[in-house]
Amino acid sequence: MNLPPLTPPDFGTVQNFFFPVFWGVEDREAITNLARAVTEQVEPAFHFADNFLTWGRNNSMFQDLPFVKAWQDNVDCDSDFAIVWRRYVLACAAYHAVHLDGDFVECGCYRGVGIKTVVDYLGGVEFPRTFWGYDLFEYVPGMEHHPMRDHGPGLADEIKAKFAAYPQVNIVQGEIPAVFASRSPDSISYLHIDLNQATAEVAALDALFDRVVPAGIIILDDYEWAMAYRRQKLTEDPWFEKRGYRVMPLPTGQGLVIKR
């Protein structure tokens, strides 16, 4: 496998990251100014974006140069730039999972940015696994989750075209879980679920969790987010508890599970 080498860090250099894109506030300017004032009083490196502020961190993602290139090459909006820590969680999980047998799966691939960042980080067109991306790509009124900016006719074809040079990436349009009946892998080493609603996420877990191989990784994008996403945690916690698992909450808002 042609995997990215570890970039030796400079002991004396750490990189700050301040990108004021966040959600759930009324006065964005006030929050930005408060965060900037905090960063002027703390030790480096600080990181402010995506609803969290921390300092005294290595900000390792910015020292991993192959990741930085994959991330920057695939950013297509401010939100993608802001969630760099979330993207690096995916990249590191994928680096682990690519050493296992099993395909990669993302439920809720939307514009394909998460998939393509991971694939480009781990070899690009030489990515050594099959990657399945599922999405309805359209918003139907009455759905449990909110519409996304680019939902609508033509989005599925646009995302399929994005991966035209990647024969190992399968973009599948359809409603979860019914879509799995026609096209889905038998064995999974990496499962990323980002459906923005509890009902569909539990349906995806019902269908796919038993296919995840031992040591495979499940990442729940919205697990530790409250606000509009709190129902996902409240629904998924008992689901995992029945199976003897506890989701690891991450400060990025994600949740992580390692399959036994």
For each feature predicted by the language model, list its residue ranges.
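Rossmann-like AdoMet
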Residues: 1-87, 93, 98-100
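S-adenosylmethionine/decaboxylated-SAM
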Residues: 52, 56, 60-81, 99-260
